[in-house]
């Protein structure tokens, strides 16, 4: 399964679809690992108002679907069933690591990693229809994704003992 990896470079949107193995490698020790560490250090010293200046230099991972550029905008290429949950507002990076380990130990978790700030955890959970397939049409994918997101929140929140930050379950977010 692939996800979309994108960033703005010199004002131009650059999008790539990548396999999950590539993304896991990128998160562990890819070329952006140094940039992530640098931004984390700066975030610890910066005021909240400036954090967007720092984080805009890094790529964005859209776990829910793959996309392609279409003229002036982007278009859904394929829905992949990945739901992204976020546990935000943790006290420290060590607490975030502990929550990440708990989430990674659950059998439903595909991927769990500490967020850019070092005080959040991102959890990727795969979902499929009862027959093992995924919705093909965009509207069906949106409805399925919203239901899968709610199910994932109801499952993970009591398991982790942490509050899942409720987000709008966009296909572009995960």
What is each model feature region?
Residues 1-81:
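DNA replication initiation on ssDNA origins
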Residues 3-11, 66, 72-93, 128-174:
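DNA replication initiation modules
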Residues 43, 47-51, 103-107, 152-160:
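Hydrophobic, Leu/Ile/Phe/Ala-enriched alpha-helical segments that form helix-helix packing faces
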Residues 73-78, 112-118:
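Short glycine/proline-enriched loop/turn "hinge" motifs that connect secondary-structure elements
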Residues 83-86, 113-114, 122:
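Structural recognition of the beta-strand scaffold that forms the well-ordered cores
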Residues 92-108:
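Short amphipathic alpha-helix segments
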Residues 111-117, 166-171:
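Short beta-strand
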Residues 115-130:
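Short, conserved phosphate-binding/catalytic loop or strand-edge motifs used
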